[in-house]
């Protein structure tokens, strides 16, 4: 007498029960807005060393836009302004 036993779904996949019972709301990171967009946003200028130095790391490298939340267009302008300021010796290429 062979009986076929159908296993319960929760016994086969314990992760399925965990997601159903202890389901949490997923964490949504707040979308950052570009610091150079908006009505009173600062203009990117190679002579504004204080503004440009905010977007440089401790080593003098340009910080990527995924960290600074700068839009792609403004990141290109920012990189160009930083490179221009470096060329004119307003900003250092590297920091020791």
Curated annotation (Swiss-Prot):
Under Gene3D superfamilies, the record lists: Ribosomal protein S18
Q: Which domain of life is it from?
A: Bacteria
The UniProt GO MF terms for this protein read:
small ribosomal subunit rRNA binding; structural constituent of ribosome
Q: InterPro entries, from UniProt? A: Ribosomal_bS18 (IPR001648), Ribosomal_bS18_CS (IPR018275), Ribosomal_bS18_sf (IPR036870)
* Presence of the UniProt keyword Ribosomal protein in the record: yes
Disulfide bonds, paired cysteine numbers? none
Reply yes or no: does the keyword Hydrolase apply.
no
Task: Print the keywords alphabetically.
Answer: Ribonucleoprotein, Ribosomal protein, RNA-binding, rRNA-binding
Q: Which GO terms describe its cellular component?
A: cytosolic small ribosomal subunit
Q: Which PROSITE patterns match?
A: RIBOSOMAL_S18 (PS00057)
What are the transmembrane regions? none
Gene Ontology BP terms: translation
Q: Which PANTHER family match?
A: 30S RIBOSOMAL PROTEIN S18, SMALL RIBOSOMAL SUBUNIT PROTEIN BS18M
Described purpose of this protein according to its UniProt entry? Binds as a heterodimer with protein bS6 to the central domain of the 16S rRNA, where it helps stabilize the platform of the 30S subunit.
Q: Which family does it belong to?
A: Belongs to the bacterial ribosomal protein bS18 family.
- Subunit: Part of the 30S ribosomal subunit. Forms a tight heterodimer with protein bS6.
For this protein, the record's HAMAP family field holds: Ribosomal_bS18 (MF_00270)
- Protein name in UniProt: Small ribosomal subunit protein bS18
- Annotated source species: Gluconobacter oxydans (strain 621H)
Q: Which gene encodes it?
A: rpsR
